[in-house]
Amino acid sequence: MTSVRKAFAVVAGAAAVILTPATAHADPGHQVTYTVTTPNTLTATIQYMNSDPPSQAAYNADSSKYMNNVQAPISDGQPVVYTTTLANPNQWAIVTASGILHWPDSGNGPAAFHCEIAVDGQVVAKQDATSAVTCATRPW
């Protein structure tokens, strides 16, 4: 190869590297952990986002495609934990819990709940409430 051809090959190769768009690596998503506890003995209705909707409109049209709805026995502060992967947890991570006390085990009065959302191991939202609780990474 002549020196002109070598120089052209080097310049062409460098231009190809510079002009070729970088391959986008898909975000593998973030591990989202939802935790619900109560000091009471009850069956809780727990809902949590298990997959990212493509848009708010899609979520509004059929939230059951993206939310899990679970009836879970829970008591004595023992955590109920659900884990999923979300691409955009800042937009979509949410967990709600409500329940009815089992009388006489829990006495009278409203149920007390605590919820937390952790993203990649870091707690990003937590809330305490009576009767029903919601933890979310954004206002709903």
Please tell me what each predicted stretch does.
Residues A15-I18, A26-H30, A132, T137-W140:
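Activation corresponds to long, low-complexity, non-globular regions
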Residues D27-K65:
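Short, surface-exposed binding/anchoring microloops in extracellular/periplasmic proteins
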Residues V81-T137:
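Extracytosolic low-complexity repeat regions of secreted or lipid-anchored proteins
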Residues M1-A26:
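Secretory targeting and sorting signals
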Residues A26-P28, N40, D76, A87-P89, ...:
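Solvent-exposed loop and beta-edge segments used for protein-protein assembly and interaction
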Residues Q56-Y59, N68, G121-K126:
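Surface-exposed loop/edge segments in extracytoplasmic proteins
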Residues S3-V11, V70-V80, Q127, T134-A136:
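Generic detector of solvent-exposed, compositionally biased contiguous segments
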Residues Y59-A87:
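Tryptophan-paired
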